[in-house]
């Protein structure tokens, strides 16, 4: 795989991945301060970090115990680099354990803590500058530090945690037992900002303009005079990739828009009009709907759906590429969240993403993924910076597998049509209500469940459609949107009256976690 990444002269803070469910949020929060940040494996060596030249390092939380035989470790030379290090939860315990302190099961020193707790600051610290002496933080640990290494001192504790914050300012080493990256730590952003700006000396000048200039340079360096194929899905991500690549390599880019029969209502024509017309991208439109739907017939398992679609998507590309000369690269709109949710060596796979785990091993192309260091809100900001109109940039997110993962169970034309029509009504009414910017994502799902109803004087036995609407910043966590009842009522009434084979509407009021945004 060809990795499109950030050039070496950018200030960056590296987050070492120890398997926490929150580790991606650490990088996301740091980026909010205008500082580039990304995750790296905990197996990285001190020499590799020297080559990256970060201004700071964060050791993430994790599910293991630092004293266990299978515990994730750290190259001890990293502590000698002179780079500021912040250990969070497991990261603090790792610093303690490796530098001569003591970590034990929490029952031997206070209690386990899961949830909000009050942090009591006992000394002033640059890390906590501008925050109150007592503050609510999110704890999530089953082990505790009982002895701190030589050169460290106590900064803060809680009722159940004797060492909740420690530091060795001489060596620029800091440890906190709680999670500042989550919103339940009320002053968590201030703490992370203090680390990035005050302790690491970040300038805070990272922006989308930086990203555009450096990614264009990197793309040109990687591609040279060769040709690139881009798959357009109709979503924001691939559209932004198309405009970025066109700026970088011009007519070396050919876009293939594969109509796999799983698109939203009128999506094909809209894609051709927006990107082919307004931006002049060279787009080949391929009607492969029968090819995909035949393969998906009777397939119920969502992971199998994703794999089938991912494989066939690339085989369609192979077929089209064989008609072209000298195509070496396949571009995708893979995001940072896609990579994270598809699993790392320390974290379990949540779901395989079409842009990550669904590609065949015998693929003929090298991959280019210009957005794979960005979160969704950053992609929108990138689109605006590229001069794209808001109707494209704020287009509703749409997964690569399309409506296949918005139809529960086996896919049929009838089920697909219920989702297409109901989704169009939902989007129309959300826009009419002026909520299209407040609600981060919204769509409908054919649940595959039929229920009894009465329409007119007759009995019906038709599908139940679920409405999913969420609010979020980056897609990693989300709350269900509290839509006004009158809006929901109008949407429900219209769907039942206007969409055939539907007689019941339900509203999904589940947050992420525990649920994911998509149902499959």
Swiss-Prot record:
Taxonomic superkingdom: Bacteria
Any one GO CC term of this protein is: cytosol
> EC?
6.3.5.2
All residue ranges annotated as the GMPS ATP-PPase domain in the record: 206-395
UniProt xrefs under PANTHER family: GMP SYNTHASE [GLUTAMINE-HYDROLYZING] (PTHR11922:SF2), GMP SYNTHASE-RELATED (PTHR11922)
| Function, in words | Catalyzes the synthesis of GMP from XMP.
Which protein is depicted? GMP synthase [glutamine-hydrolyzing]
């Amino acid at each position: 795989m060809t990795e499109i990444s950030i050039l070496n002269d950018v200030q960056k803070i590296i987050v070492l991945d120890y398997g926490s469910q929150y580790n991606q949020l650490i990088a996301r929060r740091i980026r909010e301060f205008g500082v580039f940040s990304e995750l790296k494996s905990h197996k990285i060596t001190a020499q590799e970090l020297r080559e990256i030249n970060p201004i700071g390092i964060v050791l993430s939380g994790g599910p293991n115990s630092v004293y266990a035989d299978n515990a994730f470790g750290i190259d001890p030379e990293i502590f000698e680099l002179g780079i500021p290090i912040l250990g969070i939860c497991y990261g603090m315990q790792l610093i303690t354990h490796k530098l001569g302190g003591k970590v034990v099961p929490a029952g031997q020193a206070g209690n386990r803590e899961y949830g909000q707790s009050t942090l009591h600051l006992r000394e002033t610290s640059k890390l906590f500058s501008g925050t109150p002496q007592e503050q609510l933080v999110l704890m999530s640990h089953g082990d505790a530090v009982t002895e701190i290494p030589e050169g460290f001192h106590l900064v803060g504790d809680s009722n159940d945690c004797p060492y909740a914050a420690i530091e060795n300012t001489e060596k620029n080493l800091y440890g906190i037992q709680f999670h500042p990256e989550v919103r339940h730590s009320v002053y968590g952003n201030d703490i992370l900002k203090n680390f990035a700006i005050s302790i690491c000396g970040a300038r805070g000048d990272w922006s989308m303009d930086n990203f555009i200039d450096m990614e264009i340079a990197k793309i040109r360096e990687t591609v040279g005079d060769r040709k690139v194929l881009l798959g357009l899905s109709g979503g924001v991500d691939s559209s932004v990739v198309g405009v970025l690549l066109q700026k970088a390599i011009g007519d070396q880019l050919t876009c293939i828009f594969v109509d796999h029969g799983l698109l939203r209502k009128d999506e094909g024509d809209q894609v051709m009009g927006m990107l082919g017309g307004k931006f002049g991208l060279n787009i080949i439109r391929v009607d492969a709907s029968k090819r995909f739907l035949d393969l998906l017939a009777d397939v119920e398992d969502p992971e199998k759906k994703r794999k089938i679609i991912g494989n066939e998507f690339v085989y369609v590309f192979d077929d089209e590429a064989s008609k072209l000369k000298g195509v070496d690269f396949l571009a995708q709109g893979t995001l940072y969240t896609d990579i994270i949710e598809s699993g790392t060596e320390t974290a379990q796979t949540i779901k395989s993403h079409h842009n990550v785990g669904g590609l065949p091993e015998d693929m003929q192309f090298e991959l280019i993924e210009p957005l794979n260091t960005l979160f969704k809100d950053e992609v929108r900001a990138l689109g605006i910076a590229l001069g794209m109109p808001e109707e494209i940039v704020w287009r509703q997110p749409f997964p690569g597998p399309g409506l296949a993962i918005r139809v529960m169970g086996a896919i049929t034309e009838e089920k697909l049509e219920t989702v297409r029509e109901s989704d169009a009504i939902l989007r129309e009414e959300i826009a009419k209500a002026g909520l299209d910017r407040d609600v981060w994502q919204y769509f409908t799902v054919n649940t595959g469940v039929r229920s009894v109803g009465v329409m007119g004087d007759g009995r019906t036995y038709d599908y139940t459609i679920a409405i999913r609407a969420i609010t979020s910043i980056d897609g990693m966590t989300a709350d269900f949107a509290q839509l006004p009842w009158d809006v929901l009522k109008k949407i429900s009434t219209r769907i039942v009256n206007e969409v055939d084979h539907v007689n019941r509407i339900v509203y999904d009021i589940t947050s992420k976690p525990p649920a994911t945004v998509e149902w499959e």
